């Protein structure tokens, strides 16, 4: 059965219907194809690729050229899912650079872009949307700011000041025209309040089960990056172990008398 192409309006409509939104990351053609065939409505080419694909210590090392390369690969899957891309570190410091770089990502297949921050980037958000590119916000723990926070990932919304900032930033993003907001490592009660208060979908990661949807880094979900797994992730399968087992079995076969393939 042919699937219908999903756009930002369809994602907003899912919140209206009370339908939970499942989103995952892909960094290449085969994973984008598999996720699309599994019916995932949002596929994000995340800057998490810096850590789980390129071996960087954090996402601040990812470049625009690297994002373009991986978006182009994922876009070749021609997914029915809405395909988005993270704007990498320092690629949206002014409205002008934000639009220029969002257009670069759109040119290689991104159907929306996501950037970290709230009221402080509203000028950039408005400029991107005015340029005709759908925008998804990202609040809570901001991986691109990890070095500014001493290299630690901190839970957000624990105190009144943090809660008020989240509400202010979320309202600003919604007013600017964002079609959805990712909430990363926000205290579940605050994430639940934000979800009820906003007319646009919230997509949680490590923020409890009361958001309008959930997103995970796919290698975390499938146990493909065993060297680090966030505490809030429970892998559904352990692909890394399966790969090592298969490789070891093949190696033994090759090295056995008469082994060939």
Specify the residue positions occupied by each region the protein language model found:
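Alpha/beta enzyme core
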Residues: 2-261
């Amino acid at each position: 059965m042919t699937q219908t192409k999903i756009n930002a309006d369809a994602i907003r409509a899912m919140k209206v219907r009370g339908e939970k939104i499942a989103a995952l990351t892909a960094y290449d053609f085969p994973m984008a194809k598999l996720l699309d065939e599994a019916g995932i409505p949002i596929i994000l080419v995340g800057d998490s690729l810096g850590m789980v694909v390129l071996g960087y210590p954090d996402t601040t090392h990812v470049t625009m050229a690297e994002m373009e390369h991986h978006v182009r690969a994922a876009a070749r899957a021609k997914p029915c899912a809405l395909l988005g891309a993270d704007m990498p570190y320092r690629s949206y410091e002014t409205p002008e650079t934000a639009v220029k770089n969002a257009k670069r990502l759109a040119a290689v297949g991104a159907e929306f872009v996501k950037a970290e921050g709230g009221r402080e980037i509203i000028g950039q958000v408005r400029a991107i949307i005015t340029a005709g590119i759908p925008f998804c916000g990202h609040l809570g723990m901001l991986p691109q700011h990890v070095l500014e926070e001493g290299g630690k990932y901190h839970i957000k919304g624990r105190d009144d000041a943090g809660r008020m900032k989240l509400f202010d930033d979320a309202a600003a993003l919604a007013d600017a025209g964002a079609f959805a907001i990712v909430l990363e490592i926000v205290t579940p009660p605050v994430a639940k309040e934000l979800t009820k208060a906003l007319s646009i979908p919230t997509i949680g990661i490590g923020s409890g089960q009361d958001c309008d949807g959930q997103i995970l880094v796919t290698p975390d979900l499938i146990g493909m990056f065993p060297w680090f797994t966030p505490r809030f992730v429970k892998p559904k399968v352990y692909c890394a172990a399966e790969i090592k087992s298969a490789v070891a079995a093949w190696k033994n076969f090759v090295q056995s008398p008469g082994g060939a393939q």
